[in-house]
Amino acid sequence: MAAATLGQVWARKLLPVPWLLCGSKRCVSSIFKAADLQIQMTKEPQKKPAPSQALLFGKTFTDHMLMVEWNNKAGWGPPRIQPFQNLTLHPACSGLHYSLQLFEGLKAYKGGDQQVRLFRPWLNMDRMLRSARRLCLPDFDKQELLECIRQLIEVDKDWVPDGNGTSLYVRPVLIGNEPSLGVGMVTQALLYVILCPVGSYFPGDSMTPVSLLADPSFVRAWIGGVGDCKLGGNYGPTVAVQREAQKRGCEQVLWLYGPDHQLTEVGTMNIFVYWTHEDGVLELVTPPLNGVILPGVVRQSLLDLARTWGEFRVAERKVTMKELKRALEEGRVREVFGSGTACQVCPVHQILYEGKQLHIPTMENGPELILRFQKELKAIQYGASAHDWMFRV
């Protein structure tokens, strides 16, 4: 895509990102540019998965990766696409010791026209920069990074799977690479991007609902914390709770917050409730962006689609377990589901809360809304329905 065209598109999509007090303003004048991108092609290309081969999430990687290094004296070095390889890190690397690291996750889809498109990557770039500033990691130009990612996908375009529900998962990462045991702002950092061909979250056209453990003794995030940033430190501590959920016969965790047991997230997904509110109005509601939950790209997309339809009320506000239990008792709940890049939309059919199993009638109701969201998203992502959410590679 020509630079001028990319700039026009970006101008329509760009969201403001406020400075934090610790934001590394010293880095603003130092940006890497896609025009300086260096490309080194692999001499040992891997065998690509067969079309019939099952693609497990995050297990298969493409031939190349994007790498950009930064230090506080020279700023950003030139970006380079190079053969996929292991990293060499100092044993005292601050990204390993103090979780000074963040990541993103987005997908590229191959349409029936064989055109590859990224789904709303501008939102991922915005979120990535917000996360970087929260950790005092160096700033970068979102437009330039997106163009570098586009060129990386173009180099490995033959890895983009062509099949129903398949995609190329894109994982940008930014880590502090300080070779010191001191805790503070880094003087070295590393940004890299790797690619994974992935299959459908739900095999075929099936849609398997999940059961949730809702235990208020476990907390994922809190007001004033970093729950709204995509940091590695938000994910590692959830593994033990996920294991506890499995011990209790549940697939995922419903994260609660506060003394009133507010619904926040499902596993690593945002959560939605489709119900008739106590005021008698049909409504789709999801928790607000108050700093506790991650501002998901699919979350925003579902809200945008629902508001475009104009068929029911769409709300972003606090929802408590007390409200959900009452609505279930009164038969007002239609569907409960999670949303995220991996699954798009995932139905919920059961919640274990305070020692009792709460049945959610999601599947008995179609799930009508979930299937509609899935259909609309798929049409947009695979190019059957033209939409300015998609960024052509």
Swiss-Prot record:
One of its GO terms (molecular function) is branched-chain-amino-acid transaminase activity. GO terms for cellular component: mitochondrion; nucleoplasm. Keywords: Acetylation, Amino-acid biosynthesis, Aminotransferase, Branched-chain amino acid biosynthesis, Lipid metabolism, Mitochondrion, Pyridoxal phosphate, Transferase, Transit peptide. It is found in: Mitochondrion. InterPro entries: Aminotrans_IV, Aminotrans_IV_CS, Aminotransferase-like, B_amino_transII, BCAT-like_C, BCAT-like_N, BCAT_family. Its main location: mitochondrion. Residues 1-27 form a transit peptide. Its EC number is 2.6.1.42. GO terms for biological process: amino acid biosynthetic process; branched-chain amino acid biosynthetic process; branched-chain amino acid catabolic process; branched-chain amino acid metabolic process; cellular response to leukemia inhibitory factor; isoleucine catabolic process; isoleucine metabolic process; L-leucine metabolic process. The modification N6-(pyridoxal phosphate)lysine is found at K230. The modification N6-acetyllysine is found at K322. It is an enzyme of class 2 (transferase). Its cofactor is pyridoxal 5'-phosphate. Substrate binds at Y169. NCBIfam families: ilvE_II (TIGR01123), PRK13357.1 (NF009897). Belongs to the class-IV pyridoxal-phosphate-dependent aminotransferase family. Homodimer. This is Branched-chain-amino-acid aminotransferase, mitochondrial. The lineage of its organism: Eukaryota, Metazoa, Chordata, Craniata, Vertebrata.
